[in-house]
Amino acid sequence: LLPAANTVIFFFSHQVPDIASVFFGQQVTTSQVIDLARDLLAEGITHARDALDWPDIKDTLERAAKDFRIACGPDNGRWSTQQLPTDAPLWAALDTLQETLGEVSRTIEPATVRAETLAQVAERLHGLMESFEQWRNHSIMSQGEMICWVEALTYSVRLNATPLSVAEGFTRQRESDHMRTWIFASAT
């Protein structure tokens, strides 16, 4: 939670369930893909300009992320995966985004030996691939432990996996902190 803190204070303890569900949940966004694409372009041009067509790689990643947002429809909104039909356009767009991440990963792999920072961006890419895959697996196999939902924002999409109960994770966190004091306060 906070590795160096001796005391954990919750001033609005009546909000602990809401906050904990976000804390113990998982999320991945298309904004992360776009940020990664821009970082990949900067590092690629700086350290391996002659290796690949970095602007094209950036554009490919950005296009896949933006197409995923477009597939969610023109309006902002939130939908649980249970509300979405299996043939909803966003599923195909998510598949395309995941395939694009995989293709880019394979394409840039030989160039990552040129600079540590380029290798670090490649590691972020692998982390994003894992996050999208984990969310997809949760959305298929959560069996009542988590609710997976899609949040379409103006320019991005956020995929969330939120536990239905935070009791176990919260208790585990609290019990692992033998040397900390926990204080809960609420005005309500």
Protein language model regions, located:
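ASCE RecA-like P-loop NTPase motor cores
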Residues: L1-T188
